[in-house]
Amino acid sequence: MKRLAFLLFASACASSGTTVENTTPKQTPIFQSAETGTLMTDRPRATAISVAAPASNVWLAVKSVYAEMEIPVVVDNPAMHQLGNSNFAKSRVLAGHPMNEFVDCGSGMTGPKATSYRIYISLLTQVSGNADGTTTVQTTFVPMGQDVSGGSSDRIPCGSTGRFEQLFLDRIKATLGK
């Protein structure tokens, strides 16, 4: 009898019809070749802060931080408050820090690949004034690496550790505090 009760209970649980929601993040193709197939990654996400300062002051602080970090600016749209560069290269060091502090391209036999690869970076910043007088700063940092020791000219997707974005936004706040 106990066995029959257990089987009835187990079958009732199995047919309860629970639905599982798919929470897998949507990925986009970023590279495709015959050798590697299609590489997928998450879409780049902006890191944002809100500061208690007018957008015009924040805009000047952002420009100052780009110059301080020696990041060449090619997108400079004051009307839309957009600033940055969608394709610049750095090797070994970024903003005075070792590249592997900010970028993860995986590891090879000699250590982190970000320390020896040429890193191509897209860094774009948007400054938006809010109705309450604060300003939102959103910055998007997307690194890709290229092995310069071999004959390959292909760039591979790299990840961000999140530390660069934090340093960048912290320096904006520090510049505003001066």
Where are these regions (language model features)?
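Sec-dependent bacterial lipoprotein signal peptides
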Residues: 1-13
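Ser/Thr-rich, low-complexity intrinsically disordered terminal regions
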Residues: 14-178
